[in-house]
């Protein structure tokens, strides 16, 4: 059932408008972007994640994305990081039930870290080490690539069994699928490399396999890297072609990512102007028919409303702003946007903590 957030008429009419996906609808245009909270690996992590996400659903968020969960062991971020397995389905139901009880929707992010993994089994399209990881990956064989595609499909089916409304396939920020699409990291000479078309084959097949496993009434968000911001990254024609191909393959929504983790270009820090990358997201929106989500340095409902009203995007992704204030949407809807506890982009207790293995919190 679509639960509406109580709102004052004509305030943020575009931001708070429902979004029809055909088989289901989102109550507004706000997506809570994925962020690793550190709860994923804690003994009582599922119960604490349930409270965390349910609180944001109660605050009015239309659809939430979990922290990254790997589809297989090789793709996990660290030795003890989470993998989606059959024995965890009931535990994940604790999260989905809590969110649904508050009228929200939630999708599980499937994240294969590739060469960003911090364990001895890390794999990648080619044996090319990242400058931000002391560990070198092993290049996957053909059979392993095919198994990885199936692993994504199986993990998505388990997510559906656990009550998730869909999955987000993580294809940006320089992670595994992004590594396959870029010449920087994909030096293969077989059917998974050489040409741009071959390099984007893996994410396209992953989305198709997820759709095959989960059926037509399941949300598939594909997180696409709009700007890699690294040498040897994807060109704009490459990005546009990938967007079109994953749409055809079964994606319902395109969420956007800006910059690889190893990029030297700031993308979310305080000095980055608000909405600095919406020009690229508007360009992507012109290439596809499915909804496109704007991300990075969107901190206020006024800014979010304007970019949707101007046709730059169909939705907005808020991660840190919803860490700072879980009632961001409810306050905007009730005419109390001036009371929102606004994210200042300091990254000191969220991103810094995430990268040093501590619980994510907020300075504001």
Give residue ranges: language-model regions:
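Flavin-dependent oxidoreductase catalytic cores
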Residues: 1-364
């Amino acid at each position: 059932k679509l639960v509406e957030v109580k709102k004052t008429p004509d305030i943020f009419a575009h931001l708070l408008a429902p979004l029809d996906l055909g088989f289901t609808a989102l109550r507004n245009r706000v997506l809570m972007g994925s962020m690793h909270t550190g709860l994923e690996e804690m003994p009582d992590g599922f119960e604490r994640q349930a409270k965390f996400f349910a609180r944001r659903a109660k605050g009015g968020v239309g659809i939430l994305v979990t922290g990254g969960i790997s589809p297989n062991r090789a793709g996990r971020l660290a030795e003890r990081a989470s993998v989606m397995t059959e024995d965890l389905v009931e535990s994940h139901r604790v999260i989905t039930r809590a969110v649904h009880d508050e009228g929200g929707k939630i999708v599980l992010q499937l994240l294969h870290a590739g060469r960003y993994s911090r364990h001895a089994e890390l794999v990648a399209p080619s044996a090319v080490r990242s400058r931000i990881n002391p560990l070198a990956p092993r290049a996957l064989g053909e059979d392993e690539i095919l198994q990885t595609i199936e692993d994504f499909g199986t993990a998505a089916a388990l997510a559906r069994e656990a009550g998730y409304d869909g999955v987000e396939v993580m294809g940006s920020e320089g992670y595994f699928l992004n590594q396959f699409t870029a010449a920087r990291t994909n030096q293969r000479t077989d059917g998974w490399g050489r040409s741009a078309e071959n390099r984007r084959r893996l994410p396209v097949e992953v989305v198709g396999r997820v759709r095959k496993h989960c059926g037509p009434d399941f949300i598939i968000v594909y997180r696409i890297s709009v700007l890699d911001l690294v040498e040897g990254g994807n060109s704009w024609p490459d990005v546009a072609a990938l967007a079109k191909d994953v749409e055809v393959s079964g994606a319902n929504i395109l969420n956007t990512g800006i910059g690889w983790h190893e990029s030297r270009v700031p993308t979310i820090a305080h000095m980055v102007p608000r909405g600095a990358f919406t020009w690229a997201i508007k360009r992507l929106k012109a290439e596809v028919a499915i909804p496109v989500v704007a991300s990075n340095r969107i901190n206020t409902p006024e800014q979010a409303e304007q970019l949707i009203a101007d046709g730059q995007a169909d939705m907005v992704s808020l991660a840190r702003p919803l860490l700072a204030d879980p009632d961001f949407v409810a306050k905007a809807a009730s005419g109390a946007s001036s009371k929102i506890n606004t994210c200042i982009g300091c990254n000191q207790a969220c991103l810094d903590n995430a990268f040093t293995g501590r619980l994510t919190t907020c300075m504001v």
